[in-house]
Amino acid sequence: VKSYANEQKAIFDGTIDVVNSMVNRVETAIKTDEKLTKEGMIEFQKNILKNNDFLYTAWIGFEDDSYLFDRYDGSDKNPYYTPKGVFQSLVTANGNGKYDLEFLPEFNKNDIYLKNAVESKKVSITEPYEYEMSGGKKVLMATVSAPIIINDKVIGVVGVDFTLEAINNAI
């Protein structure tokens, strides 16, 4: 039992490290005025999932994405924009090295996966909750997220999700 507890702690600690690396990457790019490509950000998220097979999704949500990306002009038809044109990518590992790409809903500070990170201004872990993916699939998951803070203002949140099924399988 103790070894399982240690293994689970290692997974959670690793997940927190992943989220910290995501937020550090984004904040550093903003502070150094480095324009990241949206495609590069998607690849970064895919690599996170590839290197951490217990994770289900990696995502980034912005209240204001103009700190990092040029404004959406409608010409890019990739599925990582909200209806208002904000870059909010959600990459999901669907097995066999394949990934689905969609956008998060419009940034709402009260959404369960954003709320704790926005309010605490630090890495947060949610209680398990049910989330409906764009294809209608409902998944019981938990989120580890961290705020993107520029000039003491939360402009977005990065995060990863893991399913409770994955945690149960690890035990």
Predicted region positions:
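Short beta-turn/strand-loop junction motif enriched in small, turn-promoting residues
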Residues: 6-7, 129-133, 148
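Extracytoplasmic/secreted envelope proteins and their assembly/folding machinery
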Residues: 16, 42-46, 111-114, 145, ...
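Second-shell loop/turn segments in exported
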Residues: 30-34, 100-104, 157
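Conserved beta-strands of PAS-like sensory domains
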Residues: 137-171
